[in-house]
Amino acid sequence: MDLIFPLVGSLLLVICVMVGVAFLTLL
């Protein structure tokens, strides 16, 4: 149960970075 939260946090961080990079490249 303790391993789920860091995994979700890192996954959300990767998604946010990918969305940010895609947004900047589209601009």
Swiss-Prot record:
Listed GO MF terms: NADH dehydrogenase (ubiquinone) activity
Gene coding for it: ND1
Name of the featured protein: NADH-ubiquinone oxidoreductase chain 1
EC number: 7.1.1.2
Subcellular location, principal: mitochondrion
Function comment: Core subunit of the mitochondrial membrane respiratory chain NADH dehydrogenase (Complex I) that is believed to belong to the minimal assembly required for catalysis. Complex I functions in the transfer of electrons from NADH to the respiratory chain. The immediate electron acceptor for the enzyme is believed to be ubiquinone.
Transmembrane segments: 3-23
Organism of this sequence: Simulium vittatum (Striped black fly)
Subcellular locations according to the entry: Mitochondrion inner membrane
Entry's family note: Belongs to the complex I subunit 1 family.
Phylogenetic placement of the source organism: Eukaryota, Metazoa, Ecdysozoa, Arthropoda, Hexapoda
Reactions mediated catalytically: a ubiquinone + NADH + 5 H(+)(in) = a ubiquinol + NAD(+) + 4 H(+)(out)
UniProt KW keywords: Electron transport, Membrane, Mitochondrion, Mitochondrion inner membrane, NAD, Respiratory chain, Translocase, Transmembrane, Transmembrane helix, Transport, Ubiquinone
Membrane topology category: Multi-pass membrane protein
One GO CC annotation: mitochondrial inner membrane
